[in-house]
């Protein structure tokens, strides 16, 4: 039998991500700087609830994640009718694109998170890429490229550059897009780990019906393996997404972990404090290594420009049990960029010493 499929699927190439599995090395002793997770990992309260809830695995999960949505309402101040959860932020990205953007025009600044492009391609979108290391430096030009009856994607803070747009700048983009009947999809998965002022637009979803804000518990609470994300938007958008959402996509352990995690606000505060301190440590030391240049960052990772080949450097560091993110597969970057997560001082010190030794 000859199997036929849509051309968008036949030509689709999955996005390459960080992490030990992507690097093909599961050695538990490796210090993973390639995944941008909270430097203090998972809260102890989450570990505890996961153990106590194992007996409930015999039952189906709550189809509507009722208790988690209720908890998110208290955590964010957003009404339950304006919230939806997913099996990680990724599920929500793909559901949004397939539901609202089929064959439409989208604007994607690059370099940025690759799944916006991937999901848009599967939805047969016409993509305009806007190359910039910082949208704020090309702001008016970027706004002029917003399509009609389409969508603009913004990662804020941006992965992998670490740049962040202000709430005022984002509001201007939202208004410009609204005049063109376009969505604005803002990914705030890293915004809770920004030590400085809060530039979130989460509370604007009731004011602007073209705004869609994505969040994740993965980064802030160290829950990468559990897969739990959420989004906020107008009730109309959320109601439509609920209709096409895969049943039971958010499992019981994910729901329970999320409920407990968002009660632990001190975890976020501690993470921010470490990130602020360790960013200064890493940048000051790495910038002093010949042919290494750190970009400024608002959040828990740093993009670094290097003279040597990024893949070769990644292999060298793996010999020292250190995994970094090779950024050559980010559209808009090349094999002279790497990204590192900000981790504990002990881990950061190890990275600096090894880089100084091998460079």
Predicted regions, residues:
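Active-site phosphate-binding strand-loop segment of PLP-dependent enzymes
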Residues: 133-195, 303
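PLP-dependent enzyme catalytic core of the Aspartate aminotransferase-like
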Residues: 168, 319-320, 331-359
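PLP-dependent aminotransferase-like
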Residues: 9, 98-154
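Phosphate-binding glycine-rich loop
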Residues: 65-105
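Conserved PLP-binding catalytic core of the aspartate aminotransferase-like
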Residues: 275-276, 289-320
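PLP-dependent aminotransferase class I/II
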Residues: 64, 210-295
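N-terminal "arm"/small-domain region of PLP-dependent enzymes with the aminotransferase-like
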Residues: 1-59, 148
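Conserved PLP cofactor-binding pocket of PLP-dependent enzymes
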Residues: 12-16, 296-297, 304, 320-342
């Amino acid at each position: 039998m000859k199997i036929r499929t849509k051309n968008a699927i036949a030509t689709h190439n999955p996005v390459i991500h960080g992490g030990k599995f992507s690097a093909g090395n599961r050695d538990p002793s490796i210090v993973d700087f390639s995944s941008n997770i909270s430097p203090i990992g998972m809260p102890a309260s989450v570990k505890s609830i996961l153990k106590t809830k194992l007996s409930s695995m015999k039952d189906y999960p709550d189809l509507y994640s009722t208790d988690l949505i209720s908890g998110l309402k208290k955590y964010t101040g957003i009404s339950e009718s304006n919230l939806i959860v997913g099996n990680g932020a990724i599920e929500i990205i793909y559901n949004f694109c397939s539901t609202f953007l089929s064959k439409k025009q989208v604007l994607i600044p690059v370099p940025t998170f690759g799944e916006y492009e991937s999901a848009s391609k599967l939805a047969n979108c016409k993509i305009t890429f806007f190359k910039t290391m910082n949208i704020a430096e090309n702001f008016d030009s970027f706004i002029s490229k917003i399509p009609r009856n389409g969508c603009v994607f913004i990662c804020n803070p941006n992965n992998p550059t670490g740049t962040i747009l202000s709430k005022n700048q984002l509001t201007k983009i939202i208004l410009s897009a609204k005049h063109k009947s376009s969505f604005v999809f803002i990914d705030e998965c890293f915004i809770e780990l920004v030590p400085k002022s809060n530039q979130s637009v989460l509370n604007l979803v009731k004011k602007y019906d073209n705004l869609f804000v994505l969040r994740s518990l993965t980064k802030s609470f160290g829950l990468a393996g559990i897969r739990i994300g959420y989004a906020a938007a107008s009730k109309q958008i959320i109601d439509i997404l609920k209709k096409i959402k895969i049943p039971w996509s958010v499992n019981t352990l994910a729901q329970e972990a999320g409920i407990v995690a968002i009660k632990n606000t001190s975890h976020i505060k501690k993470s921010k404090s470490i990130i602020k301190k360790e960013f200064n440590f890493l940048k000051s030391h790495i910038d002093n290594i010949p042919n290494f240049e750190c970009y400024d960052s608002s959040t828990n990772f740093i993009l670094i420009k290097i003279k040597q080949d990024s893949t070769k450097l990644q292999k060298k560091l793996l010999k020292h049990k250190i995994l970094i993110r090779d950024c050559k597969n980010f559209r808009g970057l090349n094999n002279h960029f790497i990204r590192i997560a900000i981790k504990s001082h002990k881990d950061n010190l190890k990275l600096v010493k090894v880089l100084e030794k091998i460079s």
